[in-house]
Amino acid sequence: DMKLSLEGIGALLSSDGLYTTVQSLVAGGPAENSNKLNAKDKIVGVGQEDDEEITDVIGWRIDDVVELIRGPKDTVVKLEIIPSSSLDESHTKVIEITRNLVKLEDLAAKKNILSITREGKEYKIGVIELPAFYMDFDAYKRREYDYKSSSKDVRKLINSLKRENIDGLILDLRNNGGGSLFEANSLAHIFLGGGTTVQVKTAKGSVHELGDRRGFQIYDDPLLILVNKFSASASEILAGAVQDYRRGLVVGTDTFGKGTVQKVETLSSGQIKFTESKFYRVSGGSTQNKGVSPDIYLPSPIDVDEIGEHKYLGALVHDNIKETKFKDFDRIGASKELLTHKHKERMTQSSIFKNLKEKKSWRVMQDNNIWISLNIDKRKANKEQSEQELLSLENELRRELGLETFQNYKEFVEREEDPQVIDIEEAILKESANILADFIEYSFQ
């Protein structure tokens, strides 16, 4: 819904074998606000507030699971989940989330300013968080002047940040699953001016370009696009265009890889949705399956290899077509290697990022251990050892940050509203601001 009027719990779900898995949470939605549900949690049961019993949904079709989860506003849904932090499927917990509408203002673009100080010099880094590419099509069709849209909001926020004399801008597209293609084009022209934003190839092989040759650029200063694995579709179009035009840095992880266009046709007894075309960057590469690779990689608190279009059975492959004409802003130059070096130096000094690296290495080791003992006592001992290792890694970081440690693994896994939560996403944003400050210092002075 481009108008961002959603009802339910605000979670994107997918089918993962027998399980319904949480792919991502809608910014500002009931699930995110509850702090009880996370990406990669598996939903194994659903119940209603007045029911004592939880319905087992293992092996169910995803649309049937969604039907159980949805319900009237202000009612409670119970979810039995296997937490993403759990080592196996034997540990579950039941959470309650109150269904609600996702308010437009919760999903609208927001601004902030981060201050980065280097050798006595302060860099004011503007941040615009954009959770979705939204547009009120009804108001647009009525030709209302001030209809709600992401591009209009971002323009206003940029002008406001300019008045506050920012030195550079971060456009935060993390967890932005896309939305209006029209808005992706409009936003691209804010940073690129006129030109092609994306190419579209139909099933019959014809290719056409989307963009605006007369687009008006309103921001021409240092720019960084922040993405993660849940940045998809329109987010990938915008990030890919900025990267191809060499207008700014793209920082984060590989994106989702959703580069196809679907169409819904009405049938006599229902509807059918089918893929009719694919997106291609101006440089010729498809965003399908592969996504957009950042100029500088940042660590991720989740296993990014287990998420994305490439994990779907029968997903269309990545391919290339001929590149189209586009302007080279040449804003990056040879600075990327220096910026990467400075970034890696900071990583070695950060408790949070060192801990993320250690946890990733530990999980890789766990995944590579394919031997399972048939002796029940040995299996229990191995499980307890793994739980203690993960708990030790978590508590090690909490001690370094001066936070209370968890007494046992059960307390760690079942935590819900931790008042001393370690905000990894905020640490990633702060490091992005440091990268942009480096970019300004070495490229724009």
Cite the ranges covered by each PLM segment:
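Cleft-lining beta-strand/loop regions that shape enzyme active-site pockets
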Residues: 2-6, 12-33, 38, 44-268, ...
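Short, compositionally biased low-complexity segments
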Residues: 36-44, 162, 401-413
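Acidic, polar loop-rich interaction surfaces within structured domains
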Residues: 229-232, 240, 247-250, 254-323, ...
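Conserved functional hotspot residues or short segments at active or partner-binding sites
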Residues: 287-444
